[in-house]
UniProtKB/Swiss-Prot annotation:
Organism: Eremothecium gossypii (strain ATCC 10895 / CBS 109.51 / FGSC 9923 / NRRL Y-1056) (Yeast)
Compartments, record wording: Mitochondrion inner membrane
Name of the protein in question: Mitochondrial inner membrane protease ATP23
Any GO BP annotation: mitochondrial protein processing
Keyword Protease: yes
A Gene Ontology molecular function term of the record: metal ion binding
Binding, a divalent metal cation: 146, 150
Topology versus the membrane: Peripheral membrane protein
GO cellular component: mitochondrial inner membrane
Gene behind the chain: ATP23
Active site (UniProt): 147
Enzyme Commission code: 3.4.24.-
Function description: Has a dual role in the assembly of mitochondrial ATPase. Acts as a protease that removes N-terminal residues of mitochondrial ATPase CF(0) subunit 6 at the intermembrane space side. Also involved in the correct assembly of the membrane-embedded ATPase CF(0) particle, probably mediating association of subunit 6 with the subunit 9 ring.
Coiled-coil regions, chain positions: none
Record carries keyword Mitochondrion: yes
Length: 247
């Protein structure tokens, strides 16, 4: 998944351990500590530091639960996500000869991401959804659809992710087919900037270039733009497994 331009550098984020006494982050005691923190009444420096640490744990726990709830909902009810998981399962059955294989939802995980991105795909590990970056269910639908296109490509075309042309082609397809470049999304991100007539293609190209720039084999933006241009025509027009751009 690509990053949008001009984002700040990665934050120093880490998963916070649960407090020794879970009662301190529940019920009246958590309300009392929150009131104390916000008003400063009776708040010691040590209590302030501990509250901030515990707050991060509570926040990450809530984000994680919401992320998995949204993931499970999309796996049941999103037409794009359901279709893509069906197509991926079909490819897996064809490759293995095992007709009992279903899509493995355990390979879609939620976690905290320091980088300013909403998700990622790793051929060995599966799909990552960034619980602290995804603002709502509908952004997750775009993100999950994007990463599922990468997973489909990995199975269908045996992508070499260190080959810049392979990588660029999959990024073009993922941004084109996921819905992340539809008009409403571009307006949300960029307002009235750019041409609405060419907005979809400009968005797909921009996001593909940014993703390729993140490949360790890519020297700079100029090379990323050149590679995307070289694969553009064939990859933008390749809508498999859809018959056309669905979203």
């Amino acid at each position: 998944m690509s990053k949008e331009p001009n984002f700040p550098p990665s934050e120093k984020l880490e998963k916070v351990e649960a407090p020794a006494d879970l009662r301190s982050i529940a019920g009246f005691e958590w309300w009392r500590r929150t009131f104390e923190y916000k008003t400063g009444l009776g708040l010691t420096p040590e209590a302030k530091v501990q509250y901030e640490k515990d707050y991060q744990y509570v926040l990450q726990r809530e984000q994680c639960k919401q992320c998995y709830d949204n993931r499970d909902w999309l796996l049941k009810y999103s037409p794009t996500v359901v279709f893509m998981t069906q197509q991926i399962a079909k490819l897996n059955r064809r490759r293995t000869g095992d007709d009992s294989l279903h899509f493995d939802t355990s390979k879609i995980i939620c976690d905290v991401c320091p980088e300013w991105k909403s998700g990622g795909f790793n051929p060995s590990l599966g799909i990552l959804l960034c619980q602290n970056r995804i603002r709502d269910k509908w952004q997750m639908e775009d993100t999950l659809s994007h990463e599922l296109v990468h997973q489909f490509d990995e199975l269908k075309f045996e992508v070499d992710w260190m080959n810049l042309k392979h990588h660029a082609c999959s990024e073009v397809r993922a941004s084109n087919l996921s819905g992340e470049c539809r008009l409403s999304q571009e307006f949300f991100r960029r307002g009235f900037n750019g041409s609405f007539g060419r907005g979809h293609q400009e968005c797909v190209r921009r996001r593909a270039v940014l993703s390729v720039m993140g490949n360790p084999k890519c020297k700079d933006k100029a090379e990323a733009e050149q590679i995307v241009d070289e694969v553009w025509q064939s990859c933008f027009n390749d809508t498999r497994p859809f018959e056309e751009i669905y979203r």
